[in-house]
Amino acid sequence: MSDQGTNNGESGNGGAQNGEAPQLRVLTQYVKDLSFENPNAPQSLGPADEQPSINVRVDVGVKRMSATDFEVALKIGAEATVKDKAMFLVELDYAGLFRVVNVPEQDLEAVLVIECPRQIFPFARRILADTTRDGGFPPLMIDPIDFVGLYNQRHQQAPDAAAAAKPN
């Protein structure tokens, strides 16, 4: 195949006005940081008297790498406790490098903090499940995340928090 006649997405984000279709491509995805703590092992690995309480935190960060390329990092942390005693703590920073072309500027933030994390979430979820299982616990299967709700919540809470998610 020939590369003639293609712009490889380097024309910037203005193409949407020219009738070109918006494009979102995952260039790569990777673990930036992974931490697992099992502070009370091996005592915490036996049968528990009660179900652990699991607190899950989710955040999305965006970093502009070029005119069309963005790193989107999905940060997920989970802590399991029984009677205020830590069972495990897992933190994952999982990112993808995305190429976004022909998306109007007013829609760019929503694409980056909703659609991009939605595409990499299943991979991050599997890593968390495998990590907790390898730590001696049942796999932690996080429910699907409502990234639209997270986006709306961030905009309602404070304009400063919403500005932090905008590509820089």
Swiss-Prot record:
GO biological process: protein folding; protein tetramerization; protein transport
Coiled-coil spans in chain: none
Stored Pfam families: SecB
Regions of compositional bias (Polar residues) in chain numbering: 1-10
UniProt-listed InterPro entries: SecB, SecB-like_sf
Molecular-function GO terms, alphabetical: unfolded protein binding
UniProt-listed NCBIfam families: PRK05751.1-3, secB
PANTHER family (UniProt xref): PROTEIN-EXPORT PROTEIN SECB, PTHR36918
Family: Belongs to the SecB family.
Name of the featured protein: Protein-export protein SecB
Organism in which the protein naturally occurs: Parvibaculum lavamentivorans (strain DS-1 / DSM 13023 / NCIMB 13966)
Gene transcribed to yield this protein: secB
